[in-house]
Amino acid sequence: MYPDPSIVRVGDTYYMVNSTFEYYPGIALSRSFDLLNWEKLPGIAQTIEQADLRSAKSNEGIFAVCIRYNQGFFYVITTNFAEFKNFIIRGYLNEDQTAIIWENQRIEIDIFGIDPDLYFEDNRTYVQFTGYVEGGKKAIQQVEIELETGNILRGPEVLSFGTGGRDVEGPHILKEKGAYYLLAAEGGTGQGHMITMFKGESLWGPFQPAPTNPLFTNRDRAEEPLQNIGHADLFQDTLGNWWLTCLGTRPATIDHIQITNLGRETLLYPVEWTEEWPVINKGIPSLEVDLADFPNHSQALSNPQNLSKFTDYFISEQLDPE
């Protein structure tokens, strides 16, 4: 349920996307005004032109979605593993600002990898992704693209091989305090999952690992109810506070087999920056967050919205909500 979260804020509204794998409509989209209550919006990829899922097997299709906003447009970038293609779908708010209109024509990017991320700077567009390099090793790589066409202008170039954990992936780039920060996931999406971070003075590196890596994980705390913490994204609220969203599971063990009935879920944690590095929820991926420890963050959650409820008995041709 709602894995691989990515969140962007536009004005006072937060938009979140999640992976949907082999199911239509592809790319789950939700909206919130308070970060606590989320309204599900129509899925983004609803046509074959946007994402052809006809050959997708279980757990293939759309995964590792990222949403960004730049110069009046939403940009959602993702991988369709069934086609093994990476692409962008562009959208914009309608006239009364109540819905996003998504373009049917996607922008394909010719990279050999998965988990793409978008970063905009000085009217230039950069894509970070994970893929294999010579020797069969996985690495976070980067290309500069022409946004309208997806054509590659520079790269791919390696940014990081991670900290040594398996399957370095899920990259996101952000700029803070005059430096570039590369967020990544390592260890696979199972029990070894962890969030790591790297810092560079240039967008093209070199990137140095945080001294406290892994930045956020429960891989060595098997007693914690939340496990498999990883695949994170960072964003700011309306008051300028930083937050981290990531995936996690609440597993049960039956006959020595770990079972997650709700799959990978979306989690949200407050972030505080030290002089150089972010600290996520005091460093602990806890099931609950004591907001008394984060008075500035709690102010952003002080006006919860009321969401309408609905019931559908599946007796008509259309489903509620539309």
Predicted regions and their residues:
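Carbohydrate-active catalytic/glycan-binding domains of CAZyme proteins
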Residues: 1-322
